[in-house]
Amino acid sequence: METALAEVQLSCLLCEQTFDATEKLDEHLPTHFPQPVSTGQTCDICGRTMRSSLELHQHYKRYHEAHVPNTEGHFQCQLCDKVFLLQDHLKVHVKIEHATDGYQPDEKSLDWQHYSPRSLDTTNDYKLDPILCPPPKRKYPPRSPFFNPNLWLGADNCFM
């Protein structure tokens, strides 16, 4: 019986080339099915892969903004050395972290040229700032069967 298995010729279904061992056929098949070339962009910091360079840039801004090295056009906090790509994010950082420290940002910002620590009032700013106080979540109707499984119709009720 073993001699019959040894004489079996395996053929490739795509090019009809014959092989005497399954290992050789397995080595041959990748010639017809090459591995896809990775077109994704990989984050240097965390290793996550994005589909485009735009998604990678948005990923950097969202998750690694404080870890980006300081270059021209970036805004650096003078107290904790965090770096932000957008000036608005630096402002929010200042409001949250250093509002009572008497902090003055660097000269890149025109809004802060007339800044004095005594004039910074953060008591009512949180009501106007959408970053510090996001809008409330939407409320869905409590009687909606989509969100309440107790209101789902059983399959046995449909055939009566």
UniProtKB/Swiss-Prot annotation:
The modification Phosphoserine is found at residue 116. One of its GO terms (cellular component) is nucleus. The keyword DNA-binding applies. The keyword Iron-sulfur does not apply. Keywords: DNA-binding, Metal-binding, Nucleus, Phosphoprotein, Repeat, Transcription, Transcription regulation, Zinc, Zinc-finger. It comes from the Eukaryota. A zinc finger (C2H2-type) spans 10-32, 41-64, 75-98. It is found in: Nucleus. Its main location: nucleus. InterPro entries: ZnF_C2H2-type_TF (IPR050888), Znf_C2H2_sf (IPR036236), Znf_C2H2_type (IPR013087). PROSITE patterns: ZINC_FINGER_C2H2_1, ZINC_FINGER_C2H2_2. One of its GO terms (molecular function) is DNA binding. Pfam families: zf-C2H2. The modification Phosphotyrosine is found at residue 115. May be involved in transcriptional regulation. This is Uncharacterized zinc finger protein CG12744.
